Design a protein with these regions (language model features):
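Short, internal active-site loops enriched in acidic
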Residues: 167-168, 198, 327-332
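Iron-sulfur (Fe-S) cluster-binding segments and ferredoxin-like electron-carrier domains
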Residues: 127-139
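Eukaryotic intrinsically disordered, low-complexity regions
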Residues: 161-163
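Conserved AdoMet/S-adenosylmethionine-binding subsite of the radical SAM
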Residues: 145, 149-159, 168-314
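C-terminal accessory regions of radical SAM enzymes
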Residues: 304-342
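N-terminal pre-triad scaffold of radical SAM enzymes
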Residues: 52-55, 98-129
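Flexible, acidic/Gly-rich N-terminal and inter-domain linker regions that tether
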Residues: 1-106
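Conserved, mostly hydrophobic/aromatic
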Residues: 59, 124, 282
Length: 342
């Protein structure tokens, strides 16, 4: 068994300490970045009543000071556009608010999604679950055990997805308990974890967690949620190296966001940075139509044009699949790029 390299150094804050010290005030966030709050930014402060602001300081450190249009800042800063009630947008765009048991969504035939934790380290303003009733789907051992009983009773389920919120908000001992239960179910072969924590607080990838993944009888897949190359730093690359040593398959999915990554060169830079970190670009999602996020929307026609250009900038294996998720559909829906017609 390969030795797992530890990332714990005297200067490295414990991830739980970092969680307790996140920024929750728009005013403090702008002050830390030396951004002068104009009338528009000031008006956006009230959007935290709709969806709280929450940003780890490690993520803020990667933002450009003095730039109100920084692509990382734009993903997390409250905006007055969140008050717009846009036609065609919903508080439940993927029709997820009906669990088979508390916290378990059986959306696809062979896969079920377990909402491990409702909280996140960062609140992304475009989040499609910003209105999700987490209070009714608590991440408790009682609910987790009920979910495991359901999984055990459905032999078609060979892959379980840990989601949230953010599943890595669970502590290492909680994840160990969940994995032990899953490993005892013979028909479950794969564990997929979707998380933004490794990018916003790379210290979350502890030696204990990596070692637990390495010992698992399950195939473990981590799907990172990274939208811009500027998010990727040395700590993230080191965390990914530790997970690769542990045999974890590393993927990434992004959301195509107006004013963040809505051009081909930015997406090419992201794919290159991910690949250099040992992470394979996987999906590029068009925005889920959740109320409060319409200002991030990139049209399908624009998305196709961006993807066609992206194909000319990087190798094909680094091009993510452009897709959307539609409530009630049995899988993600790829967007046809119209290449045959050109």
């Amino acid at each position: 068994m390969a030795h797992i390299v530890t990332l714990n150094t005297p200067s490295r804050e414990d991830w739980i300490t970092q969680l307790a010290n996140v920024v929750t005030s728009p005013d403090e966030l702008l002050r830390l970045l030396n951004v002068d709050a104009d009338e528009k930014l000031l008006a956006g402060r009230e959007a935290r009543r709709l969806f709280p602001l929450r940003v780890p300081r490690a993520f803020i450190a990667r933002m450009e000071k003095g730039n109100p249009n920084d692509p990382l800042l734009r993903q997390v800063l409250t905006a007055e556009e969140e008050f717009i009630v846009a036609p065609g947008y919903s508080t439940d765009p993927l029709e997820e608010q009906h669990s088979v048991v508390p916290g378990l969504l059986h959306k696809y035939r062979n896969r079920a999604l377990l909402l491990v934790k409702g909280g996140c380290a960062v609140n992304c303003r475009y989040c499609f679950r910003r209105h999700f009733p987490y209070a009714e789907n608590q991440g408790t051992r009682r609910n987790w055990q009920t979910a495991m009983d359901y999984i055990a009773a459905h032999p078609q389920l060979d892959e379980i997805i840990f989601s949230g919120g953010d599943p890595l908000m669970a502590k290492d001992h909680e994840l160990d308990w969940l994995m032990t239960l899953l490993e005892a179910i013979p028909h479950v072969k794969r564990l997929r974890i979707h998380s933004r924590l490794p990018i916003v607080i790379p210290a979350r990838i502890t030696e204990t967690l990596a070692s637990r993944f390495q010992r698992s009888s399950l195939q473990v897949i981590l799907v990172n949620h990274v939208n811009h190359a500027n998010e990727i730093d040395g700590e993230f690359r080191a965390a990914m190296a530790m997970l690769r040593q542990a045999g974890v398959t590393l993927l990434n999915q992004s959301v195509l966001l107006r004013g963040v990554n809505d051009n081909a060169q930015t997406l090419a830079d992201l794919s290159n940075a991910l690949f250099d970190a040992g992470v394979m670009p996987y999906y590029l999602h068009v925005l889920d139509r959740v109320q409060g996020a319409a200002h991030f929307m990139v049209s399908d026609d624009e998305a196709r044009e961006i993807m066609r250009e992206l194909l000319t900038l990087i190798s094909g294996y680094m091009v993510p699949k452009l897709a959307r998720e539609i409530g009630g559909e049995p899988s993600k829906t790829p967007l046809d790029l119209g290449l045959k017609q050109r």
